[in-house]
Design a protein with these regions (language model features):
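Metallocofactor- and cofactor-centric catalytic cores in central/energy metabolism, strongly enriched
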Residues: 1-162, 167-171, 176-213
Length: 213
Protein backbone atom coordinates (compact mmCIF):
# COMPACT_ATOMS: atom_id res chain seq x y z
CA UNK A 1 0.00 0.00 0.00
CA UNK A 2 1.28 3.46 -0.89
CA UNK A 3 0.05 6.58 0.85
CA UNK A 4 2.15 9.05 -1.15
CA UNK A 5 0.21 11.44 -3.39
CA UNK A 6 0.72 11.17 -7.13
CA UNK A 7 1.86 14.62 -8.26
CA UNK A 8 1.03 16.34 -11.53
CA UNK A 9 2.95 19.55 -12.22
CA UNK A 10 1.55 22.22 -14.52
CA UNK A 11 4.05 24.39 -16.38
CA UNK A 12 2.86 27.89 -17.30
CA UNK A 13 5.05 30.14 -19.44
CA UNK A 14 4.88 33.91 -19.02
CA UNK A 15 5.97 36.76 -21.28
CA UNK A 16 6.33 40.51 -21.09
CA UNK A 17 4.66 42.34 -23.96
CA UNK A 18 7.89 44.11 -24.98
CA UNK A 19 9.39 40.70 -25.81
CA UNK A 20 8.13 38.23 -28.44
CA UNK A 21 5.54 35.88 -26.95
CA UNK A 22 6.88 33.19 -29.27
CA UNK A 23 10.17 33.28 -27.36
CA UNK A 24 8.46 32.10 -24.16
CA UNK A 25 6.23 29.62 -26.00
CA UNK A 26 9.11 28.01 -27.89
CA UNK A 27 11.24 27.83 -24.76
CA UNK A 28 8.34 26.23 -22.89
CA UNK A 29 7.98 23.61 -25.61
CA UNK A 30 11.71 22.89 -25.48
CA UNK A 31 11.51 22.56 -21.68
CA UNK A 32 8.59 20.13 -21.84
CA UNK A 33 10.32 18.06 -24.54
CA UNK A 34 13.50 17.92 -22.45
CA UNK A 35 11.56 16.83 -19.37
CA UNK A 36 9.58 14.12 -21.16
CA UNK A 37 12.73 12.78 -22.84
CA UNK A 38 14.46 12.34 -19.49
CA UNK A 39 11.67 11.72 -16.98
CA UNK A 40 8.58 10.69 -18.95
CA UNK A 41 5.25 12.48 -19.17
CA UNK A 42 3.31 11.09 -16.20
CA UNK A 43 4.00 14.00 -13.83
CA UNK A 44 4.10 16.97 -16.23
CA UNK A 45 1.45 19.09 -17.94
CA UNK A 46 2.09 21.83 -20.50
CA UNK A 47 -0.41 24.65 -20.12
CA UNK A 48 -1.20 26.04 -23.59
CA UNK A 49 -1.89 29.53 -22.21
CA UNK A 50 1.06 31.91 -22.21
CA UNK A 51 0.48 34.81 -19.83
CA UNK A 52 1.38 38.12 -21.52
CA UNK A 53 0.89 40.96 -19.00
CA UNK A 54 -2.79 40.15 -18.64
CA UNK A 55 -4.89 39.17 -15.66
CA UNK A 56 -7.31 37.61 -18.16
CA UNK A 57 -4.51 35.31 -19.33
CA UNK A 58 -3.68 34.62 -15.68
CA UNK A 59 -7.24 33.47 -14.95
CA UNK A 60 -7.28 31.37 -18.14
CA UNK A 61 -4.02 29.66 -17.17
CA UNK A 62 -5.22 29.11 -13.60
CA UNK A 63 -8.46 27.49 -14.75
CA UNK A 64 -6.58 25.37 -17.29
CA UNK A 65 -4.12 23.85 -14.81
CA UNK A 66 -6.96 23.25 -12.35
CA UNK A 67 -9.02 21.49 -15.02
CA UNK A 68 -5.99 19.37 -15.91
CA UNK A 69 -5.80 18.16 -12.31
CA UNK A 70 -2.46 19.75 -11.49
CA UNK A 71 -1.36 19.56 -7.87
CA UNK A 72 1.71 21.80 -8.27
CA UNK A 73 2.67 24.74 -10.45
CA UNK A 74 5.82 25.84 -12.24
CA UNK A 75 5.88 29.43 -13.45
CA UNK A 76 8.42 29.52 -16.28
CA UNK A 77 9.84 32.87 -17.32
CA UNK A 78 10.69 32.47 -21.00
CA UNK A 79 11.63 36.13 -20.98
CA UNK A 80 11.49 38.99 -18.47
CA UNK A 81 7.92 38.09 -17.53
CA UNK A 82 4.95 40.13 -16.24
CA UNK A 83 5.49 40.67 -12.52
CA UNK A 84 1.84 41.31 -11.63
CA UNK A 85 0.18 38.48 -13.56
CA UNK A 86 2.81 35.83 -12.80
CA UNK A 87 2.76 36.45 -9.06
CA UNK A 88 -1.04 36.69 -9.00
CA UNK A 89 -1.08 33.24 -10.59
CA UNK A 90 1.09 31.93 -7.76
CA UNK A 91 -1.10 33.68 -5.20
CA UNK A 92 -4.33 32.13 -6.45
CA UNK A 93 -2.99 28.63 -7.15
CA UNK A 94 -3.80 26.45 -4.16
CA UNK A 95 -0.76 24.21 -4.03
CA UNK A 96 3.04 24.20 -4.10
CA UNK A 97 4.65 26.42 -6.74
CA UNK A 98 8.09 27.00 -8.18
CA UNK A 99 9.60 29.80 -10.26
CA UNK A 100 12.33 29.15 -12.84
CA UNK A 101 13.57 31.05 -15.87
CA UNK A 102 15.21 30.49 -19.24
CA UNK A 103 18.86 31.20 -19.89
CA UNK A 104 19.84 32.82 -23.18
CA UNK A 105 20.61 30.12 -25.74
CA UNK A 106 23.46 31.96 -27.49
CA UNK A 107 24.86 35.36 -28.29
CA UNK A 108 23.92 35.04 -31.94
CA UNK A 109 20.25 36.01 -31.60
CA UNK A 110 20.16 38.83 -29.09
CA UNK A 111 17.73 40.88 -31.19
CA UNK A 112 14.72 38.54 -31.29
CA UNK A 113 16.10 35.81 -29.04
CA UNK A 114 17.01 37.83 -25.98
CA UNK A 115 14.71 37.32 -23.02
CA UNK A 116 16.35 38.92 -19.97
CA UNK A 117 14.68 36.26 -17.83
CA UNK A 118 17.47 36.53 -15.25
CA UNK A 119 16.41 40.12 -14.49
CA UNK A 120 12.76 39.07 -14.56
CA UNK A 121 13.48 36.38 -11.99
CA UNK A 122 14.94 38.95 -9.60
CA UNK A 123 11.82 41.10 -9.92
CA UNK A 124 9.50 38.11 -9.59
CA UNK A 125 11.14 37.00 -6.34
CA UNK A 126 10.82 40.53 -4.94
CA UNK A 127 7.15 40.73 -5.93
CA UNK A 128 6.43 37.33 -4.37
CA UNK A 129 7.79 38.67 -1.10
CA UNK A 130 5.66 41.81 -1.39
CA UNK A 131 2.57 39.61 -1.76
CA UNK A 132 3.64 37.22 1.02
CA UNK A 133 3.40 34.35 -1.45
CA UNK A 134 5.51 31.32 -0.62
CA UNK A 135 7.12 29.75 -3.68
CA UNK A 136 10.11 27.48 -4.14
CA UNK A 137 12.99 29.07 -6.04
CA UNK A 138 16.03 26.85 -6.72
CA UNK A 139 19.45 28.06 -5.62
CA UNK A 140 20.24 28.94 -9.24
CA UNK A 141 16.88 29.16 -11.02
CA UNK A 142 18.12 30.11 -14.52
CA UNK A 143 18.94 27.37 -16.98
CA UNK A 144 18.71 25.72 -20.35
CA UNK A 145 15.72 23.54 -21.20
CA UNK A 146 17.56 20.46 -19.90
CA UNK A 147 18.68 22.20 -16.71
CA UNK A 148 15.18 23.52 -16.01
CA UNK A 149 13.79 20.03 -16.60
CA UNK A 150 16.14 18.77 -13.88
CA UNK A 151 14.94 21.57 -11.57
CA UNK A 152 11.32 20.51 -12.07
CA UNK A 153 12.23 16.90 -11.32
CA UNK A 154 13.99 18.00 -8.12
CA UNK A 155 10.85 19.98 -7.20
CA UNK A 156 8.63 16.88 -7.36
CA UNK A 157 9.45 15.44 -3.91
CA UNK A 158 9.10 18.92 -2.39
CA UNK A 159 5.67 19.35 -3.96
CA UNK A 160 4.68 15.81 -2.96
CA UNK A 161 5.60 16.48 0.67
CA UNK A 162 3.62 19.74 0.76
CA UNK A 163 0.53 18.15 -0.80
CA UNK A 164 0.77 15.20 1.59
CA UNK A 165 1.10 17.40 4.67
CA UNK A 166 -1.87 19.53 3.63
CA UNK A 167 -3.98 16.36 3.57
CA UNK A 168 -2.58 14.88 6.77
CA UNK A 169 -4.53 14.42 9.99
CA UNK A 170 -2.78 13.18 13.12
CA UNK A 171 -4.89 11.38 15.71
CA UNK A 172 -2.90 11.09 18.91
CA UNK A 173 -3.54 9.93 22.45
CA UNK A 174 -2.25 11.71 25.51
CA UNK A 175 -3.30 13.20 28.83
CA UNK A 176 -5.46 15.96 27.37
CA UNK A 177 -9.09 15.40 26.40
CA UNK A 178 -10.55 16.01 22.96
CA UNK A 179 -11.19 19.65 21.97
CA UNK A 180 -9.11 21.22 24.72
CA UNK A 181 -6.65 22.99 22.45
CA UNK A 182 -5.78 25.61 25.07
CA UNK A 183 -3.96 22.98 27.10
CA UNK A 184 -2.78 20.93 24.14
CA UNK A 185 0.83 20.24 23.22
CA UNK A 186 2.45 22.95 21.03
CA UNK A 187 0.77 22.45 17.67
CA UNK A 188 1.13 25.80 15.92
CA UNK A 189 3.94 24.61 13.66
CA UNK A 190 1.81 21.65 12.59
CA UNK A 191 -0.99 24.07 11.74
CA UNK A 192 1.51 26.18 9.80
CA UNK A 193 2.27 23.13 7.67
CA UNK A 194 -1.42 22.57 7.00
CA UNK A 195 -1.56 19.49 9.23
CA UNK A 196 -4.71 18.81 11.24
CA UNK A 197 -4.31 17.21 14.66
CA UNK A 198 -6.76 15.65 17.08
CA UNK A 199 -5.56 14.72 20.53
CA UNK A 200 -7.59 12.33 22.67
CA UNK A 201 -7.24 11.38 26.31
CA UNK A 202 -7.20 7.83 27.60
CA UNK A 203 -10.86 8.27 28.56
CA UNK A 204 -11.69 9.27 24.96
CA UNK A 205 -9.91 6.14 23.77
CA UNK A 206 -11.77 4.04 26.35
CA UNK A 207 -15.11 5.50 25.25
CA UNK A 208 -14.34 4.88 21.57
CA UNK A 209 -13.32 1.30 22.37
CA UNK A 210 -16.57 0.62 24.21
CA UNK A 211 -18.63 2.06 21.35
CA UNK A 212 -17.06 -0.48 18.99
CA UNK A 213 -17.97 -3.47 21.14
Amino acid sequence: MSNMPNIKIGVVAVSRDCFPESLSVNRRKALIDAYKAKYGEEHIYECPVCIVESEIHMVQALEDVKAAGCDALVVYLGNFGPEIAETLLAKHFDGPKMFIAAAEESGDSLMDGRGDAYCGMLNASYNLKLRNVKAYIPEYPIGTAEECADMIHEFEPIARAIVALNSLKIISFGPRPLNFLACNAPIKQLYNLGVEIEENSELDLFEAFNKHE
